[in-house]
Amino acid sequence: MTTHRTAELSRTVTLSGTATLIAAALLTGCGGGSAAPEAPESNANPAASTDPAPPGSPTSVSSVSATDSGEAPSSETTQTTPTRPPDVARVVTAAGVSQYLECSGVGTPTILIVPGLDSSIDDWLPVLPALREQSRTCVYDRPGIGDSPAREGGGRVDSGLHAEELAALLTEAGESGPFLVVGHSYGGLVARAFINDQPSRVAGVVLAEGVTPFDDTNGSDWPEGGTVVDLPLSYQATGDGPALGTTPLVVLRASDPEGDHLGGPRYGQPQQVTAAWIAGQQAALSLSSNSIGVEATSGHVLQQDDPAAVIKSVAVVLAAVRTGTPLTCADDWQAVAATCTEP
């Protein structure tokens, strides 16, 4: 059960079961997809509404400062955010679908979290407070997941459609960006499609164990929220996109991919990651000339098993965006060539 409180955006959660987050196309030995979640009851989220939020006022924030919690080195530059709505915690209808959106905090660029397959906002609870301290942060549930009602009629979907619906959601909610896009697992494909379609709205990227368009050797479908995600079509929606130029990019991956566990070690569902997955992670670094790889000490669900790695990855991208300097490893990371590793 999840309780949303609009004023404080705090969430009380009982986590159970295993979230199926990794795309079947890049895994071996993968079982059937998790059951599609039921659409939430109309009274399940008292804070949710489709009423537009009133405009907010400009806010000044300073760039993040270095702390043990994983924030990037400080900058003297002070950023002023454009006029924005106040904190958001509601269902927004746009592009014919309704999706639950939470946005909180101040600062620019806005951190935009794109969850993995069958994954809800709840899976990001370990990192949300720290990210909101760094900058404005938005996270959402796709149709049929978490607090978002199911898509009418179900049907087949793909990363391109999900990216279009995400862009419409943000526009309808008054979140104009620019965005630091954080794509996890299948969310990496959605993030790439979003970046291709909305390049002017993207300031930085973190691909956290992101599925990449560099391999389509196993064209499987995967259920999510009463729909079927067409993975081959999802690859096509991202594979021919433009490079990121000098846009800061962190490619964050688990430290033990050959023995990775779906959902992280705590969930105990071992899945062997293929060589194509590893190669795709490496190839993703070529998307930007300002990129670094980060190896985390975790399983696939980094935000659950190694929150600090996610927080620090976002922090170094924020610092690069705000100061206009090349990406560097966090202070306590070890640099080996173009890869940063946790101690």
Where are the regions that the model predicts?
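C-terminal motif of bacterial Sec signal peptides marking the signal peptidase cleavage site
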Residues: 26-29
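Bacterial signal peptide processing site
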Residues: 31-34
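Conserved HGGG/HGGXW glycine-rich cap/lid loop of the alpha/beta-hydrolase fold
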Residues: 93-147
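Active-site loop/oxyanion-hole signature of alpha/beta-hydrolase fold enzymes
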Residues: 142-180
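Conserved hydrolase catalytic core segment
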Residues: 177-214
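Flexible "cap/lid" loop of the alpha/beta hydrolase fold
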Residues: 206-234
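Conserved loop-alpha-helix segment in the C-terminal half of the alpha/beta-hydrolase fold
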Residues: 265-293, 343
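Catalytic active-site module of serine/aspartate enzymes centered on a nucleophile-bearing elbow/loop
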Residues: 291, 295-343
